[in-house]
């Protein structure tokens, strides 16, 4: 049976929601208790992160079989700039129904994030 465009859209939206909730739980388990999904309706407004509560980071979550990383990075950057809060754009991604989460961001943003961490100050056990 072939799916209609409407069915494909609903399936994609549901997969995205499941992925975002999975990422919320993974980040909370990692020690970030304030992470939550943003309110989304009729798609989402440009500049809105998929998740909030991870200080300094604009989260774009992708739960797909095949990810166009360049497109996802561009979307994350565009949305983070639209937010106007200076958060670092990052794409959190995983393969649908398998594996763990990965993070992609430009090297310059990673350096900025890392430089502000305790790891850069030599306190790796904190």
Predicted segments, located by residue:
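Catalytic phosphate/metal-binding cores of nucleic-acid and nucleotide-processing enzymes, i.e., regions
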Residues: 1-126
């Amino acid at each position: 049976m072939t799916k209609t465009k409407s069915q494909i859209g609903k399936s994609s939206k549901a997969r995205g929601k499941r992925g975002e909730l999975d990422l919320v739980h993974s980040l909370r388990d990692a020690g970030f208790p304030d992470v939550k999904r943003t309110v989304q309706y009729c798609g989402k407004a440009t500049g809105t992160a998929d998740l909030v509560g991870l200080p300094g980071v604009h989260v774009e979550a992708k739960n797909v079989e095949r990810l166009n990383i360049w497109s996802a990075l561009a979307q994350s950057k565009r949305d983070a700039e639209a937010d106007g809060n200076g958060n670092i754009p990052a794409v959190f991604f995983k393969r649908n129904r398998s594996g763990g989460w990965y993070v992609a961001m430009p090297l310059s943003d990673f350096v900025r994030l890392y430089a502000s961490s305790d790891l850069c100050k030599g306190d790796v056990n904190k």
